[in-house]
Amino acid sequence: MRPLTDEETKTMFEKLSKYIGENIKLLIDRPDGTYCFRLHNDRVYYMSEKILKLATNVSRDKLVSVGTCFGKFTKTQKFRLHITALDFLAPYAKFKVWVKPGSEQSFLYGNHIMKSGLGRITENTDKYQGVLVYSMADVPLGFGVAARTTQECRKVDPMAIVVFHQADIGEYIRSEDTLT
Amino acid sequence: MASCSIEDVLAKAERDEAEKLKSITVLKELDLEFDPGLLLAFDKNRLDTRDFKGNKREDCLRSLARDNTQLLINEIWKLPTERVDEVIVAKLPEPTTKLPREKPAPKPKPPTKWEQFAKLKGIQKKKKTNLVWDEVHKEWKRRWGYKRAKDDTKEWLIEVPATADPNEDQFAKRNKAKKERVARNEYNRLKNIARAQKVKVPGTGLLPTSQQTKAELAQAVSLAKISTASVGKFQEKLPKEKPARNTGKKRKFQPLIGDFSSEKQKQLDLLKVMDSKKPRLDITKAVNKQMREEDSESARNNKKGFGKKGRKGGMPGKGKGKGKPGGKGKAPKGKGRKPQMKQGKR
């Protein structure tokens, strides 16, 4: 486990800012204690200082996970968000998409969201903007990337993809053995 | 009674005397083997086990040791003796018994680089005669060293080779070459020692070579650059010069549990920088805003004609309460929208 280098921090923040914008500040500067990001096995974990100090007692090869996994760095040093980060990102989301109950299941199986399944979408959403996906009952379901702007969404045909799937809470079951 | 006692006493005294001064002749069933060179004697006689195991063990051992020592000393007296400073000294012969050595046998010397190479190539040492015939002096001279035959350092004239620079000092050149060879040999010798003792070979640096390769030149440049008093800190750089590769810079990470507040501050600063890098005017955003306004404008116009409302697929979002009708329901109608779409797709 080690702190992130400047380069890695930048890569991660750029990815996070796609979803929560400048609200990253609220993750770093928390009133309820010191929280930090740490890299372990190419994965970024978000944890409190207390947990970190406890985790130092565990040897590196035995440590599977600590705190919350936010995502991982690929071999090409790109950052990929994991679904485990959802709980921390959902409260600060800037752009949201609500999915109709009928296509919720389809999204949770890892499919893109079609226009027909789109319940609501935040006004002003840009193309390729990172969005958080909610059910109509405001339960966060996952992340995605807007394939169309809000304007374009009105005009496209019902089978057109509106939001690209990135991660969903179905992964907790689908990729149970790789999530940490 | 009295006489008896006197006889007894005398006999006892005699016995005690005999005990004190034991005879120098010792009888043994088997003769002992001696190695007077090492003052060594082997007793091959059987031990009396009854005595040995019983309570007279100490006495038995002491008498055995005394007898055998007596025999060894008898043997020493048979050797030629001489008198040195009032002391009689026996001259010991060479020892015949082989004793194991005290220290482990020395390991063979690790081969030098040349010896390794020669073994690989099957090169064997050839014995050359020490003396060779010198045609010039008409006499036998040593093959190498001082006053050697065909001594090229003693030449009073050197022919300038056709390819060489005529102004070059051939004597100086020869001297310099010799010095370099000597230095190189010394360096190799030290390297062999270092390798034999498994010490890390000291920084190789650059060796004089006749023709430097590109890599060697690059190494020479990078070495020369950092060979200043400031370790190259103020060294000027060429335009477009690449940093030297393999300079040995290691990755350094911050400590796992370091200063949390400074870590936080660093991340906040990074966020600030990232924020300031964003353009003030996001063109796509501006265009989208314009499109949206035009949309709502035309929708308001259309609303006058058609009072029908389709709420499905409405996008309230951050609805500004403009009284905007459902976008989807109206979509197929507005012909005036086509140019806007194109604008959006730009």
UniProtKB/Swiss-Prot annotation, chain A:
Q: Which GO terms describe its biological process?
A: ribosomal large subunit biogenesis; ribosome assembly
Where does the record say this protein resides? Answer: Nucleus, Nucleolus
Q: How does it assemble?
A: Monomer. Interacts with pre-ribosome complex. May bind to RNA. Interacts with NOL8. Interacts with FTSJ3.
Claim: RNA-binding is one of the keywords in the record: yes
- Stored SMART domains: PUA
Residue numbers spanned by region N-terminal domain:
1-92
Tell me a Gene Ontology molecular-function term this record carries.
Answer: RNA binding
User: Residues in domain PUA?
Assistant: 94-170
Question: Which controlled-vocabulary keywords does the entry list?
Answer: Nucleus, Ribosome biogenesis, RNA-binding
Q: What family does the Swiss-Prot or TrEMBL record give for this protein?
A: Belongs to the NIP7 family.
CDD domains of this UniProt entry? Nip7_N_euk (cd21146), PUA_Nip7-like (cd21151)
Keyword Zinc-finger applies: no
State the name under which the record lists this protein: 60S ribosome subunit biogenesis protein NIP7 homolog
Recorded hits in InterPro entries, A to Z, give:
NIP7_N, Nip7_N_euk, PUA, PUA-like_sf, PUA_sf, Ribosomal_synth_fac_NIP7, UPF0113_PUA
Q: What does this protein do?
A: Required for proper 34S pre-rRNA processing and 60S ribosome subunit assembly.
Q: What is its main location?
A: nucleus
Which Pfam families does this entry report, sorted A to Z? pre-PUA_NIP7, UPF0113
Cellular component (GO) terms are: nucleolus; preribosome, large subunit precursor
What is the name of the gene encoding this protein?
nip7
| UniProt signal peptide | none
Q: Which PANTHER family match?
A: CYCLIN-DEPENDENT KINASES REGULATORY SUBUNIT/60S RIBOSOME SUBUNIT BIOGENESIS PROTEIN NIP7
Q: Where is this region: C-terminal domain?
A: 93-180
**Species annotation:** Danio rerio (Zebrafish)
